């Protein structure tokens, strides 16, 4: 009986030890599992934070992109509205009889606001030129005959003659408006010379668009470019001399007292300055005449197909300058 009791007690002790060992192992496993779970949770949280930040950055970038696109579209819409307003003003000007008619007497002075009238006429001129250039491009791509191309080219050259006449009339009304190029886009004004393009620079731009050229054509174009450059230099020097003379006249009696004699001297100086300003119109007319003659001489040197390519290249160049101005003004500003 005692032995049985002893075995029973020993069995109970062993069983209890086994249970305690199992509990300890279970607790240790639970702790390890808990620690592993905590590390996994922290890792998941870090990954979630990175993902959230990345998504937030992507959303912000997309939002800014939408804003830039919206601003660009709004700028284009605004430009369309301005163009529509200009067309309406042009119609009003025509109804009131203050525009320069292409079939009428170009020597009549502009009435009303000369600068506005010229701007409206120039807008109309550009629209008509775009139509003519599109017709020429279609004919060139369709390999039209030389006679058909000549009709279109002659029409475009006559259209250039028209804008020079309109500028001459506008210069009588407001020579500063024409010289400053306020009727041009900002990018065009960067390359402006005496109210228009430099003929010699235009010939340089066309060099790669006219090949192949004969030796006689090359010689003719080189001579034309040199003579244009010499005429430009002479006009530029004349303008510099005029500016210096005008500055000297205006600075003649700076800081003088307001006596009657000084007032008379002041009025005399202003009269002299006004007379010198009158020569600005002459400089502008000479510069436009140089531009006009260069275009016509270029046409005479080239074949009709080369002249067609030249007119297309000239138009595309100035169109890109205008487009560059529009893109620059519509660029996103952050």
From Swiss-Prot:
Residues 1-49 are annotated as: Disordered. Plays a negative role in rice basal defense responses to the bacterial blight pathogen Xanthomomas oryzae pv. oryzae (Xoo). May function in both positive and negative regulation of rice defense genes. Binds DNA in vitro. Acts as a transcriptional activator when bound to NPR1/NH1 in vitro. Binds to the promoter sequence of CRK10 in vitro. It is found in: Nucleus. Belongs to the bZIP family. The keyword Transcription regulation applies. Its main location: nucleus. Keywords: Activator, DNA-binding, Nucleus, Plant defense, Transcription, Transcription regulation. Residues 76-90 are annotated as: Leucine-zipper. It holds the Pfam family DOG1. Residues 50-70 are annotated as: Basic motif. Interacts with NPR1/NH1 and NPR3/NH3. PROSITE patterns: BZIP, BZIP_BASIC, DOG1. This is Transcription factor TGA2.1. Plants silencing TGA2.1 display increased tolerance to the bacterial blight pathogen Xanthomomas oryzae pv. oryzae, are dwarf, and present altered expression of pathogenesis-related (PR) genes.
């Amino acid at each position: 009986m005692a032995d049985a009791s002893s075995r029973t007690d020993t069995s109970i002790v062993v069983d209890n030890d086994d249970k305690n060992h199992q509990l300890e192992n279970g607790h240790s496993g639970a702790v390890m599992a808990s620690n592993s779970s905590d590390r996994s949770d922290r890792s998941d949280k870090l990954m979630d934070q990175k993902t959230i930040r990345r998504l937030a950055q992507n959303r912000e970038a997309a939002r800014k992109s939408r804003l830039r696109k919206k601003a660009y579209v709004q700028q284009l819409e605004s430009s369309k509205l301005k163009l529509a307003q200009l067309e309406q003003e042009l119609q009003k000007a025509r109804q009131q009889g203050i525009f320069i008619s292409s079939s009428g007497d170009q020597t009549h002075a502009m009435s009303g606001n000369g600068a506005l009238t010229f701007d409206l006429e120039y807008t109309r001129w550009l629209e008509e030129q775009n139509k003519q250039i599109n017709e020429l491009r279609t004919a060139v791509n369709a390999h039209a005959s030389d006679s058909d191309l000549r009709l279109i080219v002659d029409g475009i050259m006559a259209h250039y003659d028209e804008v020079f006449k309109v500028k001459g009339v506008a210069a009588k009304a407001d020579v500063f408006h024409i010289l400053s190029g306020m009727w041009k886009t900002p990018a065009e004004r960067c390359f402006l010379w005496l109210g228009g393009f430099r003929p010699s620079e235009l010939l340089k731009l066309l060099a790669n668009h006219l090949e192949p050229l004969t030796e006689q054509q090359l010689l003719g174009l080189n001579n034309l470019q040199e003579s244009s450059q010499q005429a430009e230099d002479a006009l530029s020097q004349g303008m510099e001399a005029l500016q210096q003379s005008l500055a000297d006249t205006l600075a003649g009696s700076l800081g003088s007292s307001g006596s009657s004699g000084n007032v008379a001297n002041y009025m005399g100086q202003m009269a002299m300055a006004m007379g010198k300003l009158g020569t600005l119109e002459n400089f502008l007319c000479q510069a436009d005449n140089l531009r006009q003659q260069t275009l016509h001489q270029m046409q005479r040197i080239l074949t009709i197909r080369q002249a067609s390519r030249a007119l297309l290249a000239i138009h595309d160049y100035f169109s890109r300058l205008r487009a560059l101005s529009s893109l620059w003004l519509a660029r996103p500003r952050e």
